[in-house]
Amino acid sequence: MAYTNSPLVKYTKLSPNHSGKRTHSIDRITPHCVVGQLSAESICACFPAGRGASCNYGIGYDGKISLCVEEKNRSWCSSSPANDQRAITIECASDKTHPYAMNSNVYKSLVNLCVDICKRNGKRKLLWLGDKNKTLSYIPKSDEMVLTVHRWFAN
């Protein structure tokens, strides 16, 4: 499969923190709260060499989207190598305290980015199953993408 990156990206700073080419096709999207009202640029700056973490995209507090790891490569985001091999991972600016709310700019950009990812990967449905075991055992059909969440994989 030929991988492409989102045309919605307004800033690129590629992190060296990734495992190279994916070993699984993209059939998951894993958003995550970055726990701070960071800019798109600041999100990419969180992943210098040696940090041991990264994401494919970041969405800043103003809704601006950044590219941190190209879609063709597996990021180090969800605490699960198996999930990261098949997921586009997205760090989203959020409040620092529970419930880690995203503002409307971030949420709108997240929805637009998810639509773009699905379209570019030939997916017509984005599924939220809401249950860890159900989601992780689900085998997506060729036109489906599944949402996963970081807390399902975190230590």
Range-by-range predicted roles:
Residues M1-D84:
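N-terminal catalytic cores of peptidoglycan-degrading enzymes
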Residues M1-T12, H18-T23, K96-N155:
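Basic/polar, cationic surfaces and motifs that engage anionic cell-wall
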Residues R28, A87-T89, V146-T148:
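Structural preference for beta-strand elements that scaffold enzyme active sites
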Residues V35, E71, P81-P99, V115-K119, ...:
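Cell-envelope and extracellular/periplasmic
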Residues I59-K64, A87-T89, K119-R124:
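Short C-terminal domain-edge/linker segments immediately following a structured domain
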